[in-house]
């Protein structure tokens, strides 16, 4: 019911509210905007969703699966017809099942996302070997039978990523992704003054199933630090190493600010 118009990589409410250059970045989700281009764009995208999920080779010999979304489709071309059913909990996990009913489809090409380092593929219950093509697809020859079922399990683990060196704002910082999802750190989980946090980029990452705003998600736990900066009225002082090890909690970015106003960061310094 509420959403963001802009999608900042960090939110420190006191900065946005008091800074004219940042006050367009809201610290709470909004119900409506004066310039509301998003709702019609969402409607347009959903109306054409089928063409984003599936595609056909020009000679119609190969069915392409581009997006992993629960769906059913009937393909009809030049007198040929078959049905496709895709079942998945993606992006909660990398398990996908595709059923093709009809003998008029001989091959299927399934997108192999760049974030996945490997995949297990089964055709009609038998594990088969498939390589990722240069174009990023897994090509499977279907058996000559009425119903074919392809089961895939893409490897999906949390990964620490870095930005290109030309993005100076993210220098010596890191972020966490899991599958296609970008993660963030919120103060409700990690405490206030979130700018004091650091991440052990080589540390072990743990995942645990959780729920936020009615959405089942994977929460990621990481090893990190909290630096204690100068307090009180002193503006400057002699530098002292004041930090402690802490356990960091990260949630999917698209769910931030569903538990009240607070601080948020995607990119945090590395230790």
Feature roles, as predicted:
Residues 1-99, 133, 153-271:
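C-terminal beta-rich recognition modules with glycine/proline-rich loops and embedded aromatic residues
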Residues 96, 136-140, 148:
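Short strand-edge motifs at loop-to-beta-strand transitions and within beta-strands
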Residues 99-113:
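Surface-exposed beta-strand/loop patches in extracellular or lumenal glycoproteins
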Residues 110, 150-152:
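Hydrophobic, well-ordered secondary-structure elements that form the walls
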Residues 113-116, 155:
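Proline-anchored loop/turn motifs at beta-strand termini and strand-loop-strand connectors
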Residues 116-141, 160-166:
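Solvent-exposed beta-strand/loop surfaces of large extracellular or lumenal domains
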